[in-house]
Structure formats: structure tokens, C-alpha cells
């Protein structure tokens, strides 16, 4: 039959860590098939299932002869060390990939729960979600400097920053307020080593 309206080309956009080749191999676009017969929903499902790094994907028909794959990748906000590798965790608390090398600028999660009511009540996953919530609330400048997010209990979360600075954050509540207060404290006392925003209405700063 006519080559008109048959799939002849595939275009992929939005990939950052994944490669176009990886995405297109999993998508398995049926080149040569009639464009109208391509099951775009099945392709989207397959991509999300096989490539958990993909957060959203739109498969679109690009008339007269193309299929477009528009990918949005998950972004790591925290890393969990596991057997010498690093598990990437996104802003929704989804563990989506394991990598050998820690990506730059993503803090490491240290879960050191005291065998407390907090752990029994919230469990490791609940504590991970709190850490993710805190990481997501950090002001951009602080997030870049954050090396470790340490969770001892639900309301004992702290950050270790570059230059050995420590931030006592407290619980994940009032994150936006704490972020604003922390940014102001750091501006006012750039040489301080310890910042406490666990009670954001009464923050504290000390030299070391």
C-alpha cells in the first residue's frame, strides 16, 4: 500500500539521564505500520513500567508519518546509600533508580532512627517521606550546599551542609516558614556554624 500515513520516523524529547535509544527501544514503535493503528496508551504504559526513571510520557502522533515521545524524567531530591550504590528518591518519595555514582548536588539520606515510638508509628518509609518533604522545602542555595539529611525521628531532622555547618530542622511541619527563616539567618550570620529553625518563631544561631 501507500507509504502515506505510515510510521516512518520517531522523535524523542525531554531525556536527560536516559538516552533516546533506550527510550525508543522500550517504546518499540512499529515503523511501517499505519499511524492511526499505533496504540499510544500501551506504549506509554510500557515506557513507565520498564523505565521507572520516567515520571510522565506523552506519545503523540505527528502527522503525516511520525511518532513523538515526550518524556519527563523523575528528579532525585535525596539519595539512599545501599551496598556501595545509591538509590535515587524523587519528591514523591519514589525510589526510582540505583546508580553507582552519586549525582552532584543531591543530598544523602542518613536514617538513624532511635528505636522509638516514632519509628514504630511512622516506619522507615514514613521517615523517608518526611526527609523528602524537608529536602523539597529547602531554599535553592541551601539545597545546593546540603550534603546530608539526617533523620533520627519524626521531629528530629537535621542537615549537614558544606563547611561543616549544621541545621537543626525539627519535624517536616512548617517547611516553607523554616526555609524563609533559615535563608534570612544565613544572610545575617554567614560565618555561623549552627542554625536552629526547629521552632521557626524563635530561631537560634551559634558559632559552632
UniProtKB/Swiss-Prot annotation:
Compartments where located: Cell membrane
Gene3D superfamilies, alphabetized: membrane protein fhac (3.10.20.310)
Location of the POTRA domain: 5-74
One GO CC annotation: plasma membrane
Pfam family, one: FtsQ_DivIB_C
Keyword annotations from UniProtKB, A to Z: Cell cycle, Cell division, Cell membrane, Membrane, Transmembrane, Transmembrane helix
Name of the protein this chain belongs to: Cell division protein FtsQ
Gene that this sequence comes from: ftsQ
Amino acid at each position: 500500500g501507500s507509504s502515506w500515513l505510515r510510521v516512518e520516523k520517531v522523535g524523542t524529547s525531554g531525556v536527560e539521564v536516559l538516552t533516546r535509544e533506550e527510550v525508543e527501544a522500550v517504546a518499540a514503535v512499529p515503523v511501517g505500520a499505519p499511524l492511526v493503528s499505533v496504540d499510544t496508551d500501551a506504549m506509554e504504559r510500557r515506557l513507565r513500567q520498564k523505565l521507572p526513571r520516567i515520571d510522565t510520557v506523552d506519545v503523540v502522533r505527528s502527522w503525516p508519518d511520525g511518532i513523538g515521545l515526550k518524556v519527563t524524567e523523575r528528579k532525585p531530591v535525596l539519595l539512599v546509600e545501599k551496598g556501595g550504590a545509591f538509590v535515587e528518591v524523587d519528591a514523591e518519595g519514589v525510589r526510582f533508580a540505583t546508580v553507582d555514582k552519586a549525582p552532584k548536588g543531591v543530598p544523602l539520606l542518613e536514617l538513624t532512627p532511635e528505636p522509638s515510638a516514632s519509628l514504630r508509628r511512622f516506619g522507615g518509609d514514613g521517615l523517608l517521606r518526611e526527609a523528602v518533604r524537608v529536602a523539597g522545602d529547602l531554599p535553592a542555595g541551601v539545597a545546593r550546599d546540603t550534603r546530608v539529611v539526617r533523620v533520627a525521628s519524626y521531629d528530629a531532622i537535621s542537615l549537614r551542609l558544606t563547611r561543616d555547618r549544621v541545621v537543626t530542622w525539627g519535624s517536616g511541619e512548617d517547611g516553607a516558614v523554616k526555609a524563609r527563616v533559615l535563608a534570612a539567618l544565613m544572610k545575617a550570620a554567614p560565618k555561623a556554624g549552627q542554625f536552629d529553625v526547629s521552632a521557626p518563631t524563635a530561631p537560634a544561631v551559634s558559632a559552632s
